Each structure stands twice: as C-alpha cells, then as structure tokens.
C-alpha cells in the first residue's frame, strides 16, 4: 500500500519497508540505521521492536501477518509461554497492537488474556463490520475471540470458543483448545476453527 510493505520479522519486530528498497536512491525514514544500503538492500521506514519496547515474549516465533485498515496496522504479538510451556514470562505485555502506519507508534494495545495464555498467540487479526459496527477481531491465547473498536481499542465483546468445562493439557490431551487459525467474517457471522 502506498509503496510500502508491513511484515513481522523473525526478531518480533513490526517493520514498515519501502518496496523499492534502496533502488530509488533514498533512505526513507525515520529509521536510518540500515547496515546495508546498496541497490539490492531493503530500506526500512520504521521498525517497532515489540520484544524490547513492550516486553513481548514470542513463544516459538512471532508469526502473524499485519492487517492494514485505514491509518492503522493491527498485529498479534505472539506473546506466550516459556520453553517449559508453563510460565508466562510477561503476562502484562501486549497481545494485540494497533499501530499508526505512518509513524510506527502504538495507538492502543491490549494485554488480554494476561496470565491466561495457554501456549502462544499466532493468528492474524480480522476486520469486519458486524451489525454495521466496525471492529477488529483478535484471537486470544486463552481460546477467546476478542472484538475491539478499531480506533480506540474499546472492548466490544469477547467469546469463549471452548465449552465451559474444558481443560487445557499440553500435548493435545485436554479438551480446551487454543486458536491458531484466523477468523473469517461474512456479514454478521464470524467463522473460526479451534484445535490443540
């Protein structure tokens, strides 16, 4: 969009890059610290380091694809459990972010589900307008789907995708499932599969 691309790096960074790279002879900023600047190298416009700036601990890998709607970029941070699959290093770190697409600054964030993360959070945000109400859907690491007002992050609703008596057991032995797929909206209906 507008000659830029947004992606999540393997270092848990949300990156905005110039699709021309340095072929256009310009170092578009505000990020100007590229190590390599030849015509075959990438030109980063801004970089949001979710690991160091917000304390996100991506379990396995930060994996979502950013969603751009209007002036905002929505991402799920992949905040999750440690290698032992039990402790959550930073349950207060944001799980969901809305970022200004021009500056890379966080507009709003949510740390839901905090200490209820089962494993990790790897899905991609979804945008829809159920009942004519614009909303962005985030897939919580607790098996809940969260709906937020896109501009200010007000929680509109949330829904547990598991039976109330379900139990989480690592290794797929339990009846509680986390969310790995991405929701699809058609009209006022949201479709989403869960599994462990």
State where each predicted segment sits.
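Noncatalytic, solvent-exposed loop/strand surfaces
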Residues: 1-196
């Amino acid at each position: 969009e507008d000659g830029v691309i947004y992606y999540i790096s393997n270092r848990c960074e949300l990156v905005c890059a110039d699709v021309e790279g340095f072929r256009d002879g310009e170092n578009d900023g505000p990020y100007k610290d590229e190590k390599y600047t030849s015509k075959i190298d990438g030109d980063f416009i801004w970089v949001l380091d979710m690991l160091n700036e917000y304390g996100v601990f991506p379990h396995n890998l930060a994996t979502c694809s950013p969603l751009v709607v209007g002036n905002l970029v929505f991402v799920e941070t992949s905040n999750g459990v440690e290698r032992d699959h039990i402790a959550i290093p930073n349950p207060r770190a944001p799980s969901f972010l809305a970022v200004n697409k021009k500056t890379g600054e966080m507009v709003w964030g949510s740390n839901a589900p905090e200490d209820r993360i089962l494993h990790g959070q790897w899905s991609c945000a979804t945008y829809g307008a159920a009942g004519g109400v614009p909303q962005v859907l985030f897939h919580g690491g607790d098996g809940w789907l969260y709906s937020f007002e896109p501009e200010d992050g007000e929680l509109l609703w949330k829904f547990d995708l598991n039976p109330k008596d379900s139990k989480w057991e690592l290794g797929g032995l339990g009846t509680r499932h986390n969310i790995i797929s991405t929701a699809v909206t058609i009209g006022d209906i949201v479709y989403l599969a869960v599994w462990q």
